[in-house]
């Protein structure tokens, strides 16, 4: 049985089509627009406009992956158990925030590698022994999932394979704070926070981006490539199904895409 429903497949197809059409239209309206990089242009001269548009389309598709994850998750977890882009004002004891900051500082200073189980235990202990002083901060979270069958909550941050240096510790803090908030404010017993990388750009080699692995434990709290998509879809075939949707789109629209982009090649 497929994990991605027919209706969800159509939604994903429409998102991809929207991005492709956007860049085909840009190619038609502004065929001479280039990267603006004189060094790249000097090397690739005749091909820079097409490379520029393809790079833009790739970036825009990356921005749609969170929406695609939400579509798939609603199939697997139920619409009422999925929330995305949530803004929450979180009020926690001061010692909980200090615990989170200490964990991040130790990782930032490379004093130790991330150990998800140990970090989770420290946060839970801080919540069980709260200080009187409270702090309040507002955060935006990428996704919240609730597993009704097991009464288990999951909080996720989702990035591409090479997030910038400031994004990773920021995501780490948000995930730990949200997990603490779930323990302390809502008294949830089963909670996990997960950092998701939606594809491994070195596949089939292991994912080894040091910017990420300094802060996230591959043995807990980190989902990469097929592990992420299969988790979201609650099915070991989800990643393959999703990839096949993209392949099918590419095959059906190959001529249209080539006709639109090939006109950007400057013939000299």
Model feature map: region roles:
Residues 154, 182-213:
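Nucleic-acid nuclease catalytic cores
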Residues 1-91, 267-268:
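Nuclease-adjacent, charged terminal/linker segments that flank catalytic cores
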Residues 54-56, 126-132, 158-166:
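Surface-exposed cleft-lining segments at the edges of enzyme active sites
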Residues 3-23, 203-268:
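Non-catalytic C-terminal interaction segments of nucleic acid-processing enzymes
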Residues 85-149:
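Active-site metal-binding core of divalent-cation-utilizing nuclease and nuclease-like domains
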Residues 73, 141-162:
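Conserved catalytic cores of phosphodiester-cleaving nucleases, focusing on short active-site segments
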Residues 160-183:
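Mg2+/Mn2+-dependent nuclease catalytic core
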Residues 95-96, 167-169, 203-208:
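A short acidic (Asp/Glu
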């Amino acid at each position: 049985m497929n994990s991605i429903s027919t209706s969800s497949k159509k939604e994903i197809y429409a998102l991809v089509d929207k991005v492709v059409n956007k860049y085909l239209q840009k190619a038609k309206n502004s065929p001479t627009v280039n990267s603006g990089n004189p060094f790249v242009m000097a090397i690739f001269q005749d091909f820079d406009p097409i490379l520029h548009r393809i790079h833009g389309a790739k970036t825009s598709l990356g921005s749609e992956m969170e929406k695609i994850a939400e579509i798939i998750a609603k199939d697997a977890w139920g619409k009422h158990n999925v929330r995305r882009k949530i803004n929450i004002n979180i009020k926690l004891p001061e010692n909980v925030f200090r615990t989170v900051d200490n964990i991040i500082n130790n990782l930032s200073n490379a004093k130790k590698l991330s150990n998800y189980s140990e970090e989770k235990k420290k946060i839970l202990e801080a919540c069980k022994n709260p200080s009187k002083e409270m702090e309040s901060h507002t955060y935006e979270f990428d996704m919240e999932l609730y597993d009704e069958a097991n009464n288990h909550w999951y909080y996720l941050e989702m990035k591409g394979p090479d997030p910038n240096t400031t994004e990773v510790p920021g995501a780490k803090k948000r995930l730990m704070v949200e997990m603490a908030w779930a323990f302390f404010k809502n008294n949830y017993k089963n909670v996990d926070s997960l950092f998701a990388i939606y594809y491994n750009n070195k596949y089939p080699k292991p994912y080894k981006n040091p910017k990420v692995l300094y802060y996230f434990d591959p043995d807990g709290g980190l989902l990469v490539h097929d592990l992420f998509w299969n988790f979201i879809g609650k099915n070991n075939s989800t990643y393959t199904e999703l990839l096949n949707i993209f392949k099918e789109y590419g095959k059906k629209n190959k001529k249209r895409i080539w006709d639109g982009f090939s006109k950007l090649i400057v013939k000299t």
